[in-house]
Amino acid sequence: MAAEPVEDNCINFVAMKFIDNTLYFIAEDDENLESDYFGKLESKLSVIRNLNDQVLFIDQGNRPLFEDMTDSDCRDNAPRTIFIISMYKDSQPRGMAVTISVKCEKISTLSCENKIISFKEMNPPDNIKDTKSDIIFFQRSVPGHDNKMQFESSSYEGYFLACEKERDLFKLILKKEDELGDRSIMFTVQNED
């Protein structure tokens, strides 16, 4: 049985141009080219825990903190413990692009603007016309750790969501990965729906 030929998936360039020391290629036919962006796909309701099994929740001050909770406490404190993880199509293969939101009175979306973790009062947008965003994180499984996830910032490469103890609180922060197997940047994500 003969193999079927595969249609070439190539771009014919007809010209080149230098603009500000950058070489640009001009395509003969660019109608099938896709611009860089994130496009919203679907959302899931999830509980996020650190490796000490503490549940991520939003306190009255809208701060993301981790706390010991039983499953019934977790249910009793919903919606502050249930996060909306919205998945996005990414024009570049870097992991599953996601936003993390919570709906208390209003929807707030996790941001790492200026490397500071906070919730912004906003719905996750349907499209983000860029390759980086302070609200997009790349959710990836951790090699060698069954069902453990990590979330890398799309704005700050090499920076991950992490759990850090500060006085008596366990806070969600953005942290540069400092060592292989850093457990502070690993989480479990339990889908509720």
Swiss-Prot record:
Reported impact of F38D: Abolished ability to bind the IL18R1 receptor without affecting its processing by CASP4
Reported effect, D53A: Reduces binding to IL18R1 and the ability to induce IFNG production
Cross-referenced Pfam families: IL1
Disulfide partners: none
Substitution effect: K148A: Abolishes binding of the preformed binary complex of IL18 and IL18R1 to IL18RAP
Compartmental location: Cytoplasm, Cytosol; Secreted
Cellular component aspect of the GO annotation: cytosol; extracellular region; extracellular space
Cytoplasm among keywords: yes
SUPFAM superfamilies found in the cross-reference section: Cytokine
GO molecular function, one term: interleukin-18 receptor binding
GO biological process: angiogenesis; cell population proliferation; cell-cell signaling; cellular response to lipopolysaccharide; cholesterol homeostasis; cytokine-mediated signaling pathway; defense response to Gram-positive bacterium; establishment of skin barrier
InterPro entries (UniProt xref): IL-18 (IPR015529), IL-1_fam (IPR000975), IL1/FGF (IPR008996)
Induction (UniProt): In macrophages, release is increased by endocannabinoid anandamide/AEA.
Result when mutating R49A: Reduces binding to IL18R1 and the ability to induce IFNG production
Impact when changing L41A: Impairs binding to IL18R1 and the ability to induce IFNG production
Entry function: Pro-inflammatory cytokine primarily involved in epithelial barrier repair, polarized T-helper 1 (Th1) cell and natural killer (NK) cell immune responses. Upon binding to IL18R1 and IL18RAP, forms a signaling ternary complex which activates NF-kappa-B, triggering synthesis of inflammatory mediators. Synergizes with IL12/interleukin-12 to induce IFNG synthesis from T-helper 1 (Th1) cells and natural killer (NK) cells.
Name used for this protein in its record: Interleukin-18
Native source organism of the sequence: Homo sapiens (Human)
